[in-house]
């Protein structure tokens, strides 16, 4: 077995001996610095590839302070304020960290700010309000009594939010606040290209420039107590300035409004059905950002180095699943791996030479402290991500943070050594081939490919009570033997043939969100295309409130193919008699007690006559199966990630696709164990996803089977005979 390569480790000025030791122990072939660390010159000639973290928008306060007009900016909306009698005063910075932002009253506030009557939804004329700079407040002289008002305004980001986060989490003392500057603007643009060339001249030993990242940070706001106030890993509200917005107006031919970004205070988060204007803005940003990225990567290539992009931080506008990214010149992608979905978020990116996953835990004091258990976190991270790697591998793995902290935990060092060796073996066995896929599955939502593998993600891989029952579907798919695609409603509208070749469609989420479609179902072309796909023999799985939107006598617009509807009160007058359960169904055959954990589930779902209810609780349907024309629909109220739920989804997809007969092909009877086949490479593996020994019966591609015992987390490799 190869014991060297495909691993990147962090270093620091005071960690040279430790770095040299782990280069050998972990078989690492690349070294990197991190935020808050420096690269020691003693390691230049180790033979390892050297990554240098490069910040395009910060770590140069001399420039930032000399050019305050080109500091990065963000759109912010105040809370709602209710008018009574007389004038209404709205303070702008309430709930916002003054270390993080300051009001931009330098640019024309009448043009770039907006005061909105939230009771009517109408913006106020600029003459109806004025700004009091002394109190940093907007005053509405004659508001309508008991109407609610908000102010949307531009603010300068005077402390880079990521640097602020790192400073707060690590309790850094005496560290100068790094001010982010806007590379899109003329002076800083020219300076940035000069600065990059000078950096490359002075760092000839660097092999890979690890851009962290490019130009605009995702939306990250802190309050006065340095607490996280608002976060959206996909948020575009910090990618704005009058300079950028004037360019946008010229391109699209209509006037910009702050509301295009503010979106009633929801900031166009991925649960909101995106407006035309917001989609226009994103497309504009993608084109502009990709062009500027190409300038920088061309410079890097001219110096004979590789350009790597960190998937995160200042990555807004990069959008690696969209076509503009292919013109950016980026050689490699590295991203943080929190679970299987975030692994696929990296490994599925097309058009780069290689991808790398930065595994957890990060070597920071929040995990590496007395009483901390980094081994447990590392095990959970690796075993969770491994499912996805076995479907679509990244090319490299790595770690980040303070190496000396990790070295205080010898058991952690031992475990990571085993991970590195296992990854190399895994990669050698599956590289260059597509694993066996049982079916082609497409997740249908408003975002399509743009949010591939990131559906239902508010912050990077973090749990949310309101969405874990939906995110579990995406997580299950990340390591399942399916060819998974992501399709948008716009794709269907443009060409219904996009559904050709799909076996099963999945629509998952709450009603009137971007994930289920909302008002898009009022478009008869889209509604008919999806229902026609099922009626002609396709499969449909709806989770939560699929197609949820009140329209023309239905709440669930996919009610017909799924055979269920939600009781909103409008149909209480109708009696319902279909409540018999059919827990002996194919889908439930592997479930303990033929029951399922639906997570938060859904209230008030009932089934139409002719629908088979698999599980109902207190006369609320949790799972149902329905024949629709030549096709089939499956309704599930929620499906949090677990090994048994992986199996539930697997069987649901097979049943929806009329393919129950293919169950015993590359299959494990124990749902804690999975089988992955790489027919082109003549290999298959059986993997134990748990922390306990497991016994199973394994079925191969020809339907033959054998019994197998696996140790904790064990993976066994076999050759495909014949």
Would you name each region that the model predicts?
Residues 2-58, 62-97:
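Noncatalytic N-terminal accessory/assembly modules of large enzymes
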Residues 5-12, 28-34, 99, 169-190, ...:
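The substrate-binding groove and active-site-proximal loops of carbohydrate-active enzymes
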Residues 220-223, 230, 404-438, 478, ...:
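Extracellular ligand-binding/catalytic regions of CAZymes and related secreted enzymes
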Residues 461-486:
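Short helix-loop-beta junction
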Residues 517-594:
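A glycine-rich, often tryptophan-bearing local segment used as a flexible ligand/cofactor-contacting loop or short
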């Amino acid at each position: 077995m190869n014991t060297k390569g495909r691993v990147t480790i962090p270093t620091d000025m005071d960690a040279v001996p430790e770095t040299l030791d782990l280069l050998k122990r972990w078989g690492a072939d690349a070294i990197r610095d991190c935020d808050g660390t420096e690269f020691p010159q003693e390691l230049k000639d180790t033979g390892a590839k050297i990554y240098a973290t490069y910040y395009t928008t910060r770590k140069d306060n001399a420039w930032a302070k000399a050019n305050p007009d080109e500091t990065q900016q963000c759109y912010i909306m105040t809370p709602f304020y209710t008018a009574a009698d007389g004038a209404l005063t709205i303070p702008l910075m309430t709930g916002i960290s003054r270390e993080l932002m300051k009001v931009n009253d330098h640019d024309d506030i009448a043009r770039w700010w907006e005061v909105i009557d939230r009771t009517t939804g109408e913006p106020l004329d600029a003459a109806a309000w004025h700004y009091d700079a002394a109190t940093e407040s907007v005053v509405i002289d004659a508001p309508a009594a008991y109407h609610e008002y908000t102010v949307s305004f531009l603010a300068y980001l005077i402390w880079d939010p990521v640097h602020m986060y790192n400073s707060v989490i690590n309790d850094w003392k005496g560290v100068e606040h790094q001010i982010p500057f806007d590379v899109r603007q003329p002076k800083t643009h020219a300076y940035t290209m000069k600065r990059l060339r000078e950096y490359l001249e002075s760092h000839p030993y660097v092999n890979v420039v690890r851009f962290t990242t490019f130009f605009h940070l995702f939306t990250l706001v802190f309050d006065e107590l340095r607490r996280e106030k608002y976060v959206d890993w996909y948020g575009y509200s910090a990618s704005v300035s009058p300079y950028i917005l004037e360019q946008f107006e010229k391109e699209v031919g209509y006037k910009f409004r702050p509301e295009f970004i503010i979106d009633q205070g929801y900031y166009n988060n991925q649960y909101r059905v995106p407006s035309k204007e917001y989609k226009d803005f994103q497309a504009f940003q993608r084109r502009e950002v990709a062009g500027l990225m190409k300038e920088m990567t061309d410079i890097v290539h001219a110096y004979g180095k590789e350009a790597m992009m960190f998937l995160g931080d200042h990555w807004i506008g990069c959008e690696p699943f969209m076509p503009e990214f292919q013109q950016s010149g980026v050689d490699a992608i590295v991203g943080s791996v929190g679970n299987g979905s975030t692994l696929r978020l990296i490994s599925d990116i097309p058009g780069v030479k290689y991808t790398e996953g930065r595994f957890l835990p990060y070597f920071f004091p929040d995990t590496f402290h007395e009483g901390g258990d980094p081994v447990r976190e590392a095990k959970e991270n690796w075993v969770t991500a491994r499912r996805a790697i076995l479907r679509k591998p990244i090319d490299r793995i790595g770690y980040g943070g303070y190496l000396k902290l990790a070295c205080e935990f010898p058991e952690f060092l031992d475990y990571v050594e085993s991970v590195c060796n296992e990854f190399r073996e895994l990669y050698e066995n599956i590289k260059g081939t597509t694993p066996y896929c049982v079916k082609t599955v497409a997740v249908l939502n408003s975002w399509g490919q743009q949010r591939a593998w990131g559906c239902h993600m508010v912050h990077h891989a973090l749990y949310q009570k309101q969405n874990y029952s939906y995110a579990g579907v995406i997580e299950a798919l990340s390591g399942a033997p399916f060819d998974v695609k992501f399709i948008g409603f716009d794709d269907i509208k443009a060409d219904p043939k996009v559904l050709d070749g799909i076996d099963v469609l999945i629509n998952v989420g709450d009603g009137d969100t971007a994930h289920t479609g909302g008002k898009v179902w009022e478009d008869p072309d889209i509604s008919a295309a999806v229902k026609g796909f099922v009626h002609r023999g396709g499969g449909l799985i709806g989770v939560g409130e699929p197609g949820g939107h009140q329209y023309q006598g239905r709440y669930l617009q996919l009610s017909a193919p799924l055979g269920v509807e939600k009781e909103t009160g409008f149909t209480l007058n109708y009696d319902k008699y279909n409540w018999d359960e059919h827990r002996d169904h194919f889908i439930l055959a592997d479930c303990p007690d033929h029951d399922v954990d639906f997570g938060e589930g859904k209230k008030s779902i009932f089934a139409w006559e002719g629908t088979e209810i698999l599980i109902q609780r207190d006369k609320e349907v949790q799972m149902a199966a329905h024949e629709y024309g030549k096709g089939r629909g499956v309704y599930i109220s929620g499906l949090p990630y677990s090994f048994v739920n992986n199996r539930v989804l697997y069987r649901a997809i097979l049943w929806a696709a009329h393919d129950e007969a293919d169950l015993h092909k590359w299959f494990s009877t124990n749902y804690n164990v999975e089988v992955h086949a790489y027919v082109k490479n003549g290999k298959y593996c059986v993997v134990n996803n748990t922390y306990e020994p497991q016994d199973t019966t394994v079925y191969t591609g020809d339907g033959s089977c054998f019994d197998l015992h696996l140790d904790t987390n064990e993976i066994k490799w076999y050759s495909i005979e014949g």
